[in-house]
Amino acid sequence: MSYAEKPDEITKDEWMEKLNNLHVQRADMNRLIMNYLVTEGFKEAAEKFRMESGIEPSVDLETLDERIKIREMILKGQIQEAIALINSLHPELLDTNRYLYFHLQQQHLIELIRQRETEAALEFAQTQLAEQGEESRECLTEMERTLALLAFDSPEESPFGDLLHMMQRQKVWSEVNQAVLDYENRESTPKLAKLLKLLLWAQNELDQKKVKYPKMTDLSKGVIEEPK
């Protein structure tokens, strides 16, 4: 075949056959899983997986305890307590990462609104967040979006109701987790996430070149569709 010719299109069955012929070492898969559990702070799961797989974590699992406490506080909406613990562990972290500190303060404001503490929410926004809103257009926009929840009798059902979802707390925790790991000079992104990003990048490159190939359309389920 010359370079001017287009390669034959590959079917999904042919693609799957090629994938099935590739061998991935079980130990490599186990290391990826352990890396994910440690990076995300799942201590108990990492301990059980170590017993089942024989794979040793890259760090002492006892070092995960403080991050686990911070995660539990944030996911329960105990933001001020989480800030206090972060400051006790790494006093300079929030001073040097102003956006992270703003997002934690914003989350505390969200929790006040969730509890229908309107006056406390307005006072907190004015005394703790107004200055950051003046310094950053992005912060101002996020603060205005948060305060807009007060205009609705049922803020959960408002256009800004996503701020009251558990995913919002999870988002803040993920940001804190990454910042703490970076501050401690530890790996902050699981290797598994990097591999998935690499897959998406490769598919995007093929899409831009108008190549027809069996595409993975659902990463969580591993769904691969026929070439289109």
Swiss-Prot record:
PROSITE patterns: CTLH, LISH
Pfam family, one: CTLH
Protein known as: Glucose-induced degradation protein 8 homolog
Main function: Core component of the CTLH E3 ubiquitin-protein ligase complex that selectively accepts ubiquitin from UBE2H and mediates ubiquitination and subsequent proteasomal degradation of the transcription factor HBP1. Acts as a positive regulator of Wnt signaling pathway by promoting beta-catenin (CTNNB1) nuclear accumulation.
InterPro entries: CRA_dom, CTLH/CRA, CTLH_C, LisH, Ubq-SigPath_Reg
CTLH domain residues: 63-120
Keywords annotated in UniProt: Cytoplasm, Nucleus, Ubl conjugation, Wnt signaling pathway
Species of provenance: Mus musculus (Mouse)
Quaternary structure annotation from Swiss-Prot or TrEMBL: Homodimer; may also form higher oligomers. Identified in the CTLH complex that contains GID4, RANBP9 and/or RANBP10, MKLN1, MAEA, RMND5A (or alternatively its paralog RMND5B), GID8, ARMC8, WDR26 and YPEL5. Within this complex, MAEA, RMND5A (or alternatively its paralog RMND5B), GID8, WDR26, and RANBP9 and/or RANBP10 form the catalytic core, while GID4, MKLN1, ARMC8 and YPEL5 have ancillary roles. Interacts with RANBP9. Part of a complex consisting of RANBP9, MKLN1 and GID8. Interacts with CTNNB1, AXIN1 and GSK3B.
UniProt xrefs under SMART domains: CRA, CTLH, LisH
Cellular component terms per the entry's GO annotation: cell junction; cytosol; nucleoplasm; nucleus; ubiquitin ligase complex
Subcellular location: Cytoplasm; Nucleus
Family: Belongs to the GID8 family.
Gene Ontology biological process terms in this record: positive regulation of canonical Wnt signaling pathway; positive regulation of cell population proliferation; Wnt signaling pathway
Coiled coil start-end: none
GO molecular function, one term: protein homodimerization activity
Domain LisH: 25-57
Region (Interaction with CTNNB1): 116-212
UniProt PTM: Polyubiquitinated through 'Lys-48'-polyubiquitin chains, leading to proteasomal degradation in the absence of Wnt stimulation.
Tissues showing expression: Ubiquitous.
First-listed, main subcellular location of the protein, grouped into a coarse class: cytoplasm
